Swiss-Prot record:
Belongs to the RRF family. This is Ribosome-recycling factor. It comes from the Bacteria. InterPro entries: Ribosome_recyc_fac, Ribosome_recyc_fac_dom, RRF_sf. GO terms for biological process: cytoplasmic translational termination. HAMAP family: RRF. It is found in: Cytoplasm. CDD domains: RRF.
Length: 185
């Protein structure tokens, strides 16, 4: 019974950690990352399709992303979708592909992105604390139903807290590393 609670807490916490890592890929650092386009969807024969399913997306150098559609008529649609996504650069259609030229980041942009990373980390910590609350509620229910003793419940609360502290430390470490990456010129 308790092992199920611990396993569920660990699985949910792992998902929160992965979500944070995925969120971090959307923050622009000094070099371009094609993941900044992950949320861009284009109209493809009437359905909204992720950009990477209708085109080849490549980082050609540290400041340029090239998007080459598999079907040439998609160029205008891709260009419009990127412009609408508001990622901070204007798409440049050269007739063969859409290019995104990212200017060097200013100190202010880096600091703002570091703040965003910190906010994402705090959001992940809140999720971890909510997972802890759910696990503690499950332990409390077992104790109330007399399925476990008071001593077992105390040990269970300690284990839940230990896992929570472990994940909070991991989040702090991820945020610290991301901030260092963002502020490095």
């Amino acid at each position: 019974m308790l092992n199920e609670i611990y396993t569920k807490q660990k699985q949910q916490s792992d998902k929160s950690l992965e979500a944070l890592k995925k969120d971090f890929t959307t923050i622009r650092t000094g070099k371009v990352n094609i993941n900044i386009l992950d949320h861009v969807h284009v109209d493809y024969y009437g359905s909204q399709t992720p950009l990477n399913q209708v085109a080849t997306v490549l980082a050609t150098d540290a400041s340029t992303i090239s998007i080459t559609p598999w079907e040439k008529p998609m160029l205008k649609t891709i260009e419009s979708a990127i412009a609408a996504a508001n990622i901070g650069v204007n798409p440049n259609n050269d007739g063969e592909s859409v290019k995104l030229f990212f200017p060097p980041m200013t100190r202010e942009q880096r600091e703002e992105n570091a703040k965003s990373a910190k906010a994402m980390g705090e959001k992940a910590k809140v999720a971890i604390r909510n997972i802890r609350k759910d696990a503690n509620d499950a332990v409390k229910k077992l104790e109330k139903d007399k399925a476990i003793s008071e001593d077992e419940a105390k040990k269970a609360y300690d284990e839940v807290q230990k896992q929570t502290d472990n994940y909070t430390t991991k989040i702090d470490e991820l945020v610290k590393n991301k901030e260092a990456e963002l502020l490095k010129v």
